[in-house]
């Protein structure tokens, strides 16, 4: 069973940012809220069912590519929010496996696409 959810958010690498803690907190809160609301809408859709273990592929869409370390780091708040909605710890590799990708978007286009793959009952 495969489900695809797209979040219209801009992710940034947390590793290279030098900013005030309040700005970082605001960005994290906005990302988490956007993901949680979109996930709740998706979960209520007919036919939506998640069976564990689930394989989640997060794809960053943006005008420029990040190096692999920064790409994975940019999903921190997205991953935390998805795990929260699924009711699991994001570090529980027996129930959730995470994969990170990125693809080039149009100028000014930012989004995250999550693909959930699980074996149905």
Give names to the regions the model predicted.
Residues 1-121:
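Catalytic phosphate/metal-binding cores of nucleic-acid and nucleotide-processing enzymes, i.e., regions
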């Amino acid at each position: 069973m495969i489900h695809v959810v797209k979040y219209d958010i801009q992710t940034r690498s947390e590793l290279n940012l030098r900013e005030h803690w309040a700005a970082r907190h605001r960005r994290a809160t906005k990302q988490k809220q956007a993901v949680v609301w979109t996930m709740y809408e998706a979960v209520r859709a007919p036919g939506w069912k998640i069976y564990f273990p689930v394989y989640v592929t997060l794809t960053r869409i943006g005008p420029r590519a990040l190096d692999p370390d920064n790409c994975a780091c940019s999903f921190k708040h997205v991953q935390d929010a998805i795990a929260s909605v699924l009711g699991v710890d994001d570090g529980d590799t027996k129930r959730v496996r995470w994969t990170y990708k990125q693809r080039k978007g149009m100028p000014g286009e930012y989004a995250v696409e999550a693909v959930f793959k699980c074996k149905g009952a």
